[in-house]
A protein has these predicted regions:
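Alpha-helical transmembrane segments and immediately membrane-proximal extracytoplasmic
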Residues: 1-216
Length: 216
């Protein structure tokens, strides 16, 4: 009976934490989705923004220097923070948000997957710090943040869940994070739908015929 009670308390605790992180991650991910879409649409309609790319790059570097955040800080830091007790600076989130939007606005090359992990990881790390969680629990809440922002950004809660569980270590899945991560992902995904954001889709226009030429 004591074991069941202990498990129930732990389960309820993590569902609550995961949902809270999912709400925050859903809002941030939805705003990020809107900002990137706006920046991309504006650039496509105003090609002169390409000439602003050098200035945007200088501004991004300047922002990192002013905020005293290493420019090389990125997805690797988030992964390291899950593996060990490495602190993630909170300022990393707005810097990644602004830097990615400016890059898309000026025609630069920047993927959204890494930005989603970094945004979510920063949110999760701060949540773990505020809740005074130990190293193991902090790692789990960081994964929840990663799942939440990824789900809100791409509209793929299941993919977000397993991506966050797998990206930490190649060939290893952190099954302990399944329930919290999927809870965060579903909450964040629902928020993105409420914000009017449709899941990202990629249309396949044609499938090449299978032949020696196509497989070599």
């Amino acid at each position: 009976m004591r074991t069941v009670k202990k498990f129930s308390i732990a389960f309820a605790k993590w569902v609550f934490i995961a949902c809270a992180v999912g709400v925050i991650g859903g809002v941030v991910g939805s705003l990020f989705h809107m900002a990137v879409n706006f920046a991309t649409g504006f650039r496509e309609g105003h090609s002169w923004t390409l000439y602003l790319m050098p200035l945007a790059g200088l501004f991004i570097i300047f922002s990192y220097r002013v905020c005293k955040v290493n420019e090389e800080t990125g997805t690797n830091l988030i992964i390291s923070s899950v593996r060990g007790n490495i602190k993630v600076p909170l300022l990393m989130a707005p810097l990644i948000f602004l830097g990615t939007v400016l890059t898309h606005l000026t025609g630069g090359s920047a993927g959204r997957e890494g930005a989603a992990l970094q945004l979510g990881g920063s949110i999760g790390a701060k949540a773990g710090e505020l809740l005074k969680l130990d190293e193991k629990d902090s790692s789990l809440v960081i994964m929840c943040g990663m799942s939440a922002v990824f789900a809100a950004l791409f509209g793929t809660p299941l993919t977000a869940t397993f991506f966050a569980m797998e990206v930490i270590s190649v060939g290893v899945i952190y099954y302990v994070g399944l329930v919290p991560c999927i809870a965060s992902s579903l909450i964040a995904y629902k928020i993105s739908l409420l914000a009017g954001l449709a899941p990202t889709k990629f249309n396949i226009t044609g499938i090449p015929r299978l032949s020696l030429v196509s497989v070599t």
